[in-house]
Regions:
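Small-aliphatic-rich amphipathic alpha-helix that forms the alpha element of a beta-alpha
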Residues: 45, 64, 91, 132-143, ...
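A glycine-rich helix N-cap at a beta->alpha junction
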Residues: 192-210
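Sec-dependent N-terminal signal peptides
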Residues: 4-13
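Solvent-exposed coil/turn segments that connect beta secondary-structure elements
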Residues: 69, 96-98, 105, 137-141, ...
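C-terminal segment of classical bacterial N-terminal signal peptides
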Residues: 14-18
Length: 210
């Protein structure tokens, strides 16, 4: 019996060790009671293009991503509504140390690319300064059977996610803005996206520059 328990504990520890070696970051749980009242956040919501390079704490990053694409229910439904619950959206996270893919089910950052690649998230220089840049990607094959419907649904899904991030930023005194001026073809290649996957827009997040 003791040998069985020791063996189980060994494999648990080994799994955790391997996860750390891969650079995966398990995010802290969001604080559901923090921040300003919702109605106040509506009034404070702003688009800001002026960012401090000060790093964001992991707790803030956790809550930004939860707002953007977090799982809220046991059946896997999220903070963001999608048509027929398609859940066709991915959120790539660009930071100074690399690019990660957000895993909402596990609330974790999965390493994707090494190095500071924030400059590829938009044509404006502030993308390289903001400590966190989200890039929203949509699987177009999962939404609708015409280009018009695909564009409509993809924009709606990413728009809902970005508004969640806007309201969270307002709640925490952060700066953010949605950016459509970006080289989508270059990002598609960089992120090794499939033919049916499309970059929608980016959204830098950080402390406002004083």
């Amino acid at each position: 019996m003791k040998k069985s328990v020791i063996l189980v504990l060994f494999f648990v520890a080994l799994t955790a060790f391997c996860g750390e070696n891969k650079g995966e970051k398990i995010l802290p749980k969001p604080d559901m009671k923090s921040g300003k009242p919702l109605m106040e956040c509506f009034a404070l919501r702003r688009s800001s293009r002026s960012f401090s390079s000060k790093p964001l704490p992991l707790q803030i990053i956790s809550e930004v991503l939860f707002a953007a694409d977090g799982v809220t229910r046991a059946d896997g439904r999220k903070t963001v509504p999608t048509a027929r619950n398609m859940q066709n959206q991915k959120v790539y996270v660009f930071m100074a140390d690399g690019v990660y893919l957000y895993d909402g089910k596990r609330h974790a950052l999965v390493p994707f690319l090494k190095g500071d690649l924030r400059k590829h998230c938009g044509t404006q220089a502030f993308h390289s300064k903001a400590p966190l840049v989200l890039v929203f990607v949509s699987d177009m094959s999962a939404i609708g059977n015409t280009p018009e419907l695909q564009s409509l649904y993809a924009g709606n899904h990413s728009g809902s996610a970005s508004q969640n991030v806007y309201l969270y930023a307002a709640s925490k005194g952060l700066a953010t803005v949605v950016c459509g001026l970006l080289d989508r073809s270059k990002l598609k290649t960089l992120l090794k996206l499939k033919d049916n996957e499309q970059v929608i827009f980016s959204q830098p997040v950080g402390y406002p520059r004083k």
